[in-house]
């Protein structure tokens, strides 16, 4: 690796991460967001459960019924396994952040390895890899807490050996292995690679090219079959599109469950990804959300085409164009995307693809491949080449800054004090949390306190919730009554002692009320304000008794008897007053 590419990589790294290096062990890279909380839960679960007993069924949420965690989320666990040694050695926060740095570096190396297939110089390959690793798609995934979708080293190695598959059986085997690893990392990346892989194959006239690539695909299928068989044979896949409403020119965001979903798509003219949503009157609107392509990327790729060899140009376009076509989603500028619409209608695995814009991952691979020859084309003017390299990096960073993708934020690893108190209970007795389904941040809290909880992942969606748990929420007057009271509504039925004891018989000991929902404004931007905490607290005490612990962050009750879980700790600080507003209409407190 030469000096200029190394300095460009260092510049990109410091501009994206330098501001948080001093606090690398105090928080997690990314924003305080639902996917980030879920990722930390999965990494914790993988480290402490799956790696010990290889069981994916857990009763840590939706206790005591539990959930098949990987059936619930698609079975992708490889990133959790890879992150486990870092968490074990360095702790959850520092271990995760070091793992993210490794993601950046392996993506740089993977792109450099792929470009080596096209006789691109080491200088140009390292520089292109450095820029590629900080593209807006990957930064968005890391910012929002989805490292699974940012780990591309296996996909890049797959493309490396897929390109040369006609050259013998070794690249065939390696292409199959790395395609399998790509799928195990994130199933949809293996699926989204298919259109581009078919295009590369169709335009490769080398003897044995088709035969060898069919063999590589078959090997990948065999390798992932033990992990995918359960999903392939299951009739209970939630969230499938109702494809009776789809045709070559029409589509609908409705699922078979009758739930409308937002479809994540890409608008190349705006350079933004966003969601197709449907208003109640049936009007469909595209709502741009974040930048997914930089202007400088297009400039570099267009300039690189001038210097590209026919083989590099062919492969780059074969990866870029089909990926862009998928990423457009169901329509663009009012024009139906017929290939995509028909693929979703007739290919079952695509009927759960709510996010076609994730095909942009390979669109960016294509852009990088096409841009790389530019730097070799300038080799006769080394000083000019170096100046342009730094200029491109600066333009890259300016665009990232404008798009609010650099620098990456960091969120604190600390959990509310009330949950820190709960963590002192070494019996790990189950907990009933209120308000119910207020925030998925409680999944992250669980990685610290390690108690089973009544709610769980996507707990307000019946598709993802165990049927007995749903019945408990509607039929048990104690459970339903507490949920209503915490939501500032009077129960519609009298809470009975029998139903209260039914929760005790399931093993529950604690009821925790998080005070953050009652702040004004709410602690989480997406939350509905609840500003009548004093009334809520008073009504809950009628059924739960006096709290055993309270501080500014929350309240703990032991309604079936017991003392504070942190009784040996120093006395909790006094509760802070919260704004109150009474609204007794429609049964509200």
What spans do the regions from the language model cover?
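Active-site lumenal/periplasmic loops and adjacent helix-entry segments of GT-C-fold
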Residues: 20-118, 123-156, 280-282
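Membrane-embedded helix bundles of polyisoprenyl
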Residues: 9, 99-118, 123-204, 217-220, ...
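Hydrophobic, aromatic-rich transmembrane alpha-helices
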Residues: 202, 219-222, 293-326, 374-377
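Signature aromatic-anchored transmembrane alpha helix within multi-pass, membrane-resident enzymes
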Residues: 198, 214-222, 369-401
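Start-transfer (signal-anchor) and selected internal transmembrane alpha helices
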Residues: 1-22, 215-219, 306-316, 387-389, ...
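Periplasmic/ER-lumenal interhelical loops and adjacent helix-loop junctions
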Residues: 33-49, 225-305, 348, 356
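Extracytoplasmic
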Residues: 243-252, 287, 394-589
């Amino acid at each position: 690796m030469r000096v200029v590419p190394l300095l460009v990589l260092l510049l990109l790294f410091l501009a994206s991460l330098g501001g948080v290096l001093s606090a690398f062990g105090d928080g997690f890279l990314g924003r305080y967001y639902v996917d980030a909380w879920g990722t930390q839960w999965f990494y914790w679960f993988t480290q402490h459960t799956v790696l010990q007993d290889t069981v994916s069924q857990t009763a840590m949420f939706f206790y005591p019924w539990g959930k098949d965690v990987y059936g619930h989320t698609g079975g992708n666990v490889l990133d959790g396994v890879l992150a486990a040694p870092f968490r074990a050695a360095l702790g959850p926060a520092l271990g995760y952040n070091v793992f993210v740095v490794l993601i950046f570096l392996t993506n740089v190396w993977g792109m450099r390895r792929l470009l080596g297939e096209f006789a691109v110089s080491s200088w140009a390959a390292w520089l292109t890899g450095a820029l590629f690793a900080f593209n807006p798609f990957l930064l968005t995934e890391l910012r929002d807490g989805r490292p699974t979708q940012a780990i591309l080293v296996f996909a890049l190695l797959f493309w490396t050996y897929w390109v040369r598959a006609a050259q013998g059986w070794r690249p065939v085997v390696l292409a199959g292995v790395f395609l399998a690893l790509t799928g195990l990392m994130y199933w949809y990346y293996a699926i989204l690679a298919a259109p581009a892989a078919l295009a590369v194959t169709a335009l490769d006239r080398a003897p044995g090219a088709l035969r060898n690539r069919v063999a590589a695909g078959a090997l990948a299928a065999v390798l992932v079959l033990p992990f995918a068989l359960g999903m392939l044979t299951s009739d209970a896949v939630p969230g499938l599109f109702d494809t009776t409403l789809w045709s070559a020119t029409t589509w609908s965001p409705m699922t078979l469950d009758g739930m409308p979903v937002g479809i994540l798509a890409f608008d190349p003219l705006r350079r933004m990804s966003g969601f197709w949503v449907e208003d109640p009157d049936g009007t469909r609107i595209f709502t741009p959300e974040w930048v997914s392509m930089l202007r400088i990327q297009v400039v570099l790729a267009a300039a690189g085409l001038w210097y590209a060899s026919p083989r590099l140009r062919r492969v780059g376009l074969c990866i870029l164009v089909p990926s862009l076509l998928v990423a457009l989603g169901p329509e663009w500028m009012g024009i139906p995307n017929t290939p995509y619409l028909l693929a979703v209608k007739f290919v079952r695995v695509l009927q759960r693809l709510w996010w076609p814009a994730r095909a942009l991952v390979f669109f960016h691979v294509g852009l990088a491949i096409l841009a790389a020859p530019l730097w070799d084309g300038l080799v006769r003017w080394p000083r000019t080449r170096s100046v342009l390299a730094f200029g491109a990096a600066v333009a890259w960073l300016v665009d990232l800054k404008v798009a609010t993708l650099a620098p990456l934020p960091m969120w604190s690893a600390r959990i509310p004090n009330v949950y820190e108190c709960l963590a002192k209970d070494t019996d790990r007795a189950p907990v009933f949390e209120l308000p119910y389904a207020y925030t998925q941040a409680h999944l992250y809290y669980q990685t610290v306190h390690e108690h089973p909880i009544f709610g769980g992942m996507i707990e307000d969606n019946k598709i993802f919730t165990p049927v007995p748990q749903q019945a408990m929420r509607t039929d048990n007057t104690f459970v339903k009554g507490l949920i209503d009271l915490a939501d500032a509504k009077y129960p519609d039925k009298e809470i009975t002692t029998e139903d209260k004891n039914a929760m005790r018989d399931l093993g529950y000991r604690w009821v925790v009320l998080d005070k953050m929902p009652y702040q004004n404004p709410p602690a989480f931007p997406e939350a509905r304000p609840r500003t009548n905490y004093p009334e809520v607290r008073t009504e809950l005490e009628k059924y739960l008794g006096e709290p055993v612990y309270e501080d500014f962050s929350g309240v703990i009750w032991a309604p079936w008897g017991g003392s504070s879980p942190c009784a040996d700790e120093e006395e909790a600080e006094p509760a802070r007053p919260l704004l109150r507003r009474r609204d007794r209409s429609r049964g509200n407190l």
